Amino acid sequence: MVKNMDTIVQLAKHRGFVFPGSDIYGGLSNTWDYGPLGVELKNNIKKAWWQKFITQSPYNVGIDAAILMNPKTWEASGHLGNFNDPMIDNKDSKIRYRADKLIEDYMQNEKGDENFIADGLSFDEMKKIIDDEGIVCPVSKTANWTDIRQFNLMFKTFQGVTEDSTNELFLRPETAQGIFVNYKNVQRSMRKKLPFGIGQIGKSFRNEITPGNFIFRTREFEQMELEFFCKPGEEIEWQNYWKTFASEWLTDLNISEDNMRLRDHDEDELSHYSNATTDIEYKFPFGWGELWGIASRTDYDLRQHSEHSGEDFKYHDPETNEKYIPYCIEPSLGADRVTLAFLCDAYAEEGVEGSKDARTVMHFHPALAPYKAAVLPLSKKLSSEAIKIFEQLSSSFAIDFDESQSIGKRYRRQDEIGTPYCITFDFDSLEDNQVTVRDRDSMEQVRMPISELETFLAEKVKF
C-alpha cells in the first residue's frame, strides 16, 4: 500500500504517540512532545539498541556525558569553524532555506530524481543549479534569492549571571564529543584493549535552517551513538562489520528490507574528518532519508583533542609494542528518526474478512510495542476478576486494561496502537480459569490457561 505521511502524523497525534510542542500556546515551530504511547515506543527502541550494541556486545561499554561542555571542546572538534550549513534567503518571502536541501527537494519532486545529492557541491555550483533550474521559493513562488552564506548550527548560551564571551557555552550538536573526551577515562577504568567501543544515548541540539517532516529533522533531537576504536588500517573492515550489524538490527525489529538501502558517500561529500561513510537510508512517505550514518572518522577526533588539550591519546599495543592514536568507526543513529521509521513501517490498512470496513493496524515488533498485551473483560461485571490478570502481568510487562465499548471496537483500538495480544476475560473464565488470546497480526484466537500467560508473553516479546 502507498502510505501517506499526513495520515501517519494524524494517527500519532490522535493515539498519543506524538503531540505538537507547547500546543496550548499555539505551539513552537518544529517541536514535538512524545505522548504516553510515543514515550513507551521510543524507550523500547532505545532499550533494544542498548541491549544489542552495549549489553550483549563483547566490545562495548556505555557512558552518559554532560550536554554542556568546556567550549574548547568545540574548537578542537572543528564545530566552531566547520559546523555550518549553506543558507539562502528568498528576498520576497523573507524565508531562509538550506540550499542543498532546496535543490534536493526540487530534483526529487520536479525531476523525479530521488538519488540526487547536493551535499558536497560548492556554493557556486549550488547557486548555478538554483538559477539554471529556476528553482522558486515554495511560499512566494519567486526566484529572488540572496547569495548562499554559511550558517553555524550550534545553539549558544551562557553560564553564570553575566552574558559575556567568558561565560559563553554551546548546547552540544552531537553526543560523540562527550565520548572522545572520556576516551582515556573509559579505557583505563574498564581496562579495555583495542578494539572496543563506547556508546551513549542523549539529547543534541542543532539550529537547523529548514527542519521539518514531523520528527525526522528537529532542532532538539536524541542520538544513539557508538564510537568504536580500532587499529589504523583495520577501520574499513570494522566499518563493514557495523554496517551489517546495524542493518540486521533494523530488519530483526521488522523494518522491511524493501524500504532500506545503503548509500556510500562520494569523496566530495565526505565530512572533513571521514575517509569513508555509508548511510543506511529509509524510504519514508516523503522520500529517502538518512537513518544511520556509519562513518570512519580516522584518528581525527582523538588527535584534535590531544593537540588542543595536551593529553596523550596514544594507545600502547601490547601485541606489537607499537604506539598509535586509534582510528574510530562511528555508527550514529537518530532516535527520533528511527522512531518515525518504525511508525511508518508498522502502519497498515487492511481488509477484514466478513466486514466491509478496513482496519488500521500498527505491526510493531512485540519488543517495541508500547503495550505488550491488553486485558479486556467481556463485560464490566467481570472487571474485578479481570483486573487481577492485569496486576499479575503488569509487574513484568507494559499492559493495558480496557473495559469500555464493545469487544470489537476494543480490538480495533488495540490494533491501531500496535498491541500484539488481546486477552479477553469472559464468563467462562470464571469457571475454567482460561482466557481467549487474540493475535494482532493474524487475528487468530486461542484459549489459554491464565497460569500460562506470563510464560507465553515472555517468549513472544523477547528480542
Curated annotation (Swiss-Prot):
Keyword presence, Transferase: no
* The keyword Glycoprotein is assigned to this record: no
Q: Which residues are recorded as binding substrate?
A: R98, E174, F221, E222, Q223, M224, E225, E330, P331, S332, L333, G334
Q: Which GO terms describe its cellular component?
A: cytoplasm
Question: Which EC number(s) does UniProt give?
Answer: 6.1.1.14
Annotated residues that bind ATP are located at: 206-208, 216-221, 290-291, 334-337
Q: Which Gene3D superfamilies has this protein been placed in?
A: 3.30.40.230, Anticodon-binding domain, Bira Bifunctional Protein, Domain 2
What PROSITE patterns does the record point to? AA_TRNA_LIGASE_II
What's a BP term from Gene Ontology annotated to this protein?
glycyl-tRNA aminoacylation
Location of this chain's protein in the cell? Cytoplasm
Q: Which Pfam families match?
A: HGTP_anticodon, tRNA-synt_2b
Which key words are in the record?
A: Aminoacyl-tRNA synthetase, ATP-binding, Cytoplasm, Ligase, Nucleotide-binding, Protein biosynthesis
The UniProt entry lists the main location of this chain as cytoplasm
The GO molecular function terms of this record are: ATP binding; catalytic activity, acting on a protein; glycine-tRNA ligase activity; protein dimerization activity; transferase activity
Q: What does this protein do?
A: Catalyzes the attachment of glycine to tRNA(Gly).
Q: Which NCBIfam families match?
A: glyS_dimeric, PRK04173.1
Q: To which protein family does this belong? A: Belongs to the class-II aminoacyl-tRNA synthetase family.
Q: How does it assemble?
A: Homodimer.
Q: What is this protein called?
A: Glycine--tRNA ligase
User: Which species is this UniProt entry from?
Assistant: Staphylococcus epidermidis (strain ATCC 35984 / DSM 28319 / BCRC 17069 / CCUG 31568 / BM 3577 / RP62A)
